[in-house]
Regions:
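Hydrophobic alpha-helical transmembrane signal-anchor segments
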Residues: 2-41, 49
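C-terminal long alpha-helix characteristic of the crotonase
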Residues: 232-233, 264-308, 416, 471-477, ...
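Active-site proximal loops enriched in glycine and acidic residues that flank catalytic Cys/His/Asp
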Residues: 315-318, 353-355, 384-386, 406-408, ...
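Short glycine/threonine-rich loop-to-helix capping motif typified by GTGT followed
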Residues: 360-365, 498-501, 543-546
Length: 594
């Protein structure tokens, strides 16, 4: 009895101590979040002769994360947020009309982003120039993404020993067929679409002719657009820049780059402040730079709860899933769309799509919810980002108008299924599975047996049914015949200009263009607020990655903590922290970045 009493007392003490520590930690997080939220809406005072400083470095995300708190920003790097496209664009728009902003300075530091994201920034910089304010850019060295954006500047500087990595567009795909054969793993494929090449790395040792042809066309069209814009910015001929690229200009130093006309001057970084000081008529030590986050302040798009007329912007970013995920979760997105449809304040919707696709079921649920939104007599436009392909196009197809960046990748109207079979591997390891079933579909699909003809035929029929649904949705949304859509589908990806020519896209334009169109069509013109969704305020439990919230080990630990009177949310969070060292994830992503 005494032993049991002592154990219970110790357990209660440990539980109370854990609860106290977690409460303190959660409180700290709360006040950090509160301070950050206050800072994000506080009006920023910009002194006269200020300079907007745009740092091109690292990755640029579509918008602030709205699905999951990223503890890495807090633990590893303070509360500094990653750069986001929506903030950069809004800051450039604000700087163009702010009388206290005299110029824009672009500091190139190795940006990594898809071409459409960079083009959106470059286009907005070009709009900023129309205000008559100067744009200067500098880099110790420049990636092609840096140079693509910076080439629109009035004056472009590079370090005397810096290089500009102009090399063109390339993509490499790894093929695993021989490796899989060696280890005894086979992937059985069912698909519809000649160009649906995502399965090829698992069943082939080289790229198919259709896959190579579509990528060659896509890359060439994108490179031609980028060349044309860079040449226009530098007042050169596109053919001249292309010739320099082919002559490995990326290995030339700053002085040579000046001679070729790719940059204006080669200077050291310490000289930039002197140049900017002369530009705005200030002493060097009195220069005032303001970053996009600080400038945007209370002017950023957000949920305008006090407004009677709103144009909603709903972000759909990442892979489409039907269960909780870090991408587009239909379980969370569909209720948001339904709520917007039934909200009288919301007069129209812009769906911002940046997705390479995903679940057929998830795509259809989102598509049906958007149909419901339109059934309320409200206008729907789609603004495409880097990608709106496969499932990303599925959810876009029914819009009243589709806008795409000139460097958007879209299309890929096709479906595939990939079924692994590890019977060869288990045989090599001396493992021999035996299955007893009442019906043929109980253990289907199985990792341990290849599909038989009946199973393969049933799965193929399922895939073709999904493909027909895809074709029908696109045909209805684009007001085309199913036969025509089939002729341009087949899983082929298209550049935005090509997609416009064949009727998959209506306009080449920005998110701002899409918002203005919806406002005009909804009859609200300039008298409206823009409200961004999904809005999100993370709880302590939301700080745990969604994939781990369902982990059995985490749940078991959480139950133990809860048994000692620890708050449920805190208990689950603590359990995840305990189990975190054992959690790993592997992802394979293929995309184009400049």
């Amino acid at each position: 009895m005494l032993k049991k009493f002592l154990l219970n007392s110790l357990s209660a003490f440990v539980g109370a101590w854990v609860a106290l520590m977690l409460f303190i930690f959660a409180t700290v997080l709360f006040f950090i979040g509160l301070a950050a939220s206050v800072a994000s809406v506080e009006s920023v005072s910009v002194s006269k002769h200020s300079i907007l400083k745009l740092s091109l470095s690292g990755t640029i995300e579509e918008k602030e994360r709205a699905t999951e708190f990223d503890y890495n920003y807090l633990i590893q790097g303070g509360i500094e947020k990653p750069q986001t496209l929506n903030v950069i664009v809004k800051a450039l728009q604000e700087a163009a009309i702010n009388r206290n902003i005299d110029a824009l300075y672009i500091e190139c530091g190795g940006v990594s982003a898809a071409p459409a994201t960079l083009n959106a920034i470059r286009s907005q910089v070009a709009e900023f120039k129309k205000s008559g304010k100067k744009v200067y850019a500098y880099g110790d060295g420049m990636t092609m993404g840096d140079y693509f954006v910076a080439s629109v500047a009035y004056s472009l500087f590079v370090n005397p020993y810096g290089e500009v990595h102009l090399a063109g567009i390339s993509g490499t795909t790894l093929f695993f067929k021989d490796l899989l054969d060696k280890v005894g793993i086979e992937f059985e494929v069912v698909k519809v679409g000649t160009y649906k090449s995502a399965v090829e790395p698992y069943i082939m040792n080289e790229m198919s002719a259709p896959a190579r042809a579509q990528l060659d066309t896509l890359y060439t069209e994108m490179w031609d657009y980028i060349l044309k814009d860079m040449a226009s910015g530098r007042r050169m001929k596109a053919s001249g820049i292309n010739r320099l690229v082919n002559e490995f200009v990326m290995l030339k130093s700053g002085k040579d780059l000046v001679k070729y006309g790719l940059v204006d001057r080669s200077v050291y970084k310490r000289e930039i402040d002197d140049i900017m000081a002369r530009l705005v008529g200030r002493d060097r030590d009195k220069l005032h730079y303001v970053n996009p986050d600080a400038l945007v302040g209370s002017t950023s798009w957000g949920a305008a709860y006090g407004s009677k007329r709103q144009i909603a912007v709903l972000y759909a970013t990442g892979d489409i899933a039907e269960t909780p995920s870090a991408g587009i979760n239909c379980e969370k997105l569909v209720p948001v769309i339904t709520s917007l449809a039934e909200d009288d304040k919301v007069k129209g919707l812009v769906l911002r799509v940046n997705s390479p696709g995903g679940s057929v079921f998830g795509s259809e649920q989102i598509g049906e919810a958007l149909d419901y939104f339109q059934s309320k007599g409200k206008k729907l436009a789609v603004s495409m980002g880097d990608y709106a392909a496969s499932g990303g196009y599925w959810i876009s197809a029914g819009a009243d108008r589709i806008f795409a960046d000139p460097l958007t990748i879209t299309g890929s109207i096709g479906i595939f299924g990939l079924v692994p079979n590890i019977s060869g591997l288990t045989g090599k390891l001396g493992v021999h599975p035996q299955t007893v079933s009442t019906n043929p579909g109980v253990a289907f699909p199985s990792l341990f047996y290849p599909m038989n003809d009946a199973q393969r035929a049933a799965l193929q029929a399922n895939i073709e049914q999904g493909y027909d649904r895809f074709i029908s949705r696109v045909a209805k949304g684009r007001h085309k015949s199913k036969e025509y859509i089939r002729s341009i589908a087949e899983g082929r990806v298209w550049s935005a200009p090509a997609a416009k020519r064949i009727g998959l896209v209506d306009e080449l334009g920005s998110l701002s263009d899409a918002i203005k169109w919806v406002a005009s069509e909804s009859g609200v013109d300039d008298n409206y607020d823009v409200a961004v969704y999904p809005s999100y305020k993370p709880s302590v439990w939301d700080m745990v990655p969604a994939a781990l919230q369902e982990n059995a080990a985490v749940q078991e630990l959480a139950a133990r903590f809860e048994s000692h009177s620890v708050d449920k949310a805190l208990a689950r969070w603590a359990a995840w922290m305990v189990s975190r060292p054992h959690a790993q994830a592997i992802s394979l992503d293929v995309d184009i970045r400049l």
